[in-house]
């Protein structure tokens, strides 16, 4: 199975810049998409259901903000929208497709730029979910935008990010 992941930073602009061509070129079974910045009900069918894919989306309540999506060639057995805690679900940050023996999820971590405490709370709640996942007899593939840098090399301006979680 081939899985791809991309942060589009706005699905409409990404489509204008060639996202649908990129999607076709990937020939992936599942494509995880983050930062849609659009309500799915406002999108054209060419974006919702590109040729050969079924699209699934979790919108943020706030217009023009976050949102995640999955493009799947094979229809999943189940789709899980959100994680059951307000910040994640209202901001459209987690979407999971369940297949027979594994699950594929797309994930968008808050950046923490405006509210580091909210990001820390989110990470604590997300860790609880990851611990639950670890106890299940299932394989997970989580793709996404984590907004976490492992090393200073991973940051464009590491000195300015020393106080951001």
Locate predicted features.
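Active-site-proximal beta-strand elements of phosphoester/diester hydrolases
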Residues: 1-9, 101-113, 143
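Short amphipathic alpha-helices and their capping/turn segments at secondary-structure boundaries
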Residues: 20-24, 93-100, 125-138
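Soluble or luminal CAZymes and related metallo-dependent hydrolases
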Residues: 11-15, 89, 118-126
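Surface-exposed cleft-lining segments at the edges of enzyme active sites
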Residues: 84-85, 108-124, 159-164
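Short catalytic/ligand-binding loop motif for oxyanion handling, primarily in non-cytosolic enzymes
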Residues: 12, 40-42, 64-65, 112-114, ...
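Structured beta-strand-rich core segments of catalytic domains in phosphoester-bond hydrolases
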Residues: 37, 44-110
């Amino acid at each position: 199975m081939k899985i791809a992941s991309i942060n589009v930073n706005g699905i409409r602009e990404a489509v204008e810049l060639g996202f649908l061509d990129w999607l076709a070129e990937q020939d992936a079974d599942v494509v995880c998409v983050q930062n849609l910045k659009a309500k799915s009900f406002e999108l054209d069918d060419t974006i919702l259901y590109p040729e050969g894919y079924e699209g699934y989306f979790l919108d943020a309540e706030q217009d023009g903000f976050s949102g995640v999506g999955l493009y799947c060639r094979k229809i999943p057995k189940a789709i899980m929208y959100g994680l059951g805690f307000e910040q994640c679900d209202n901001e459209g940050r987690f979407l999971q497709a369940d297949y027979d023996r594994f699950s594929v999820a797309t994930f968008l971590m808050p950046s923490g730029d405006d509210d580091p405490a909210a990001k820390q709370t989110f990470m604590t709640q997300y860790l609880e979910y990851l611990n639950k996942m670890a106890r299940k007899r299932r394989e997970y593939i989580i793709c996404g935008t984590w907004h976490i840098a492992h090393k200073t090399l991973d940051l464009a301006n590491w000195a300015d990010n020393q106080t951001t979680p």
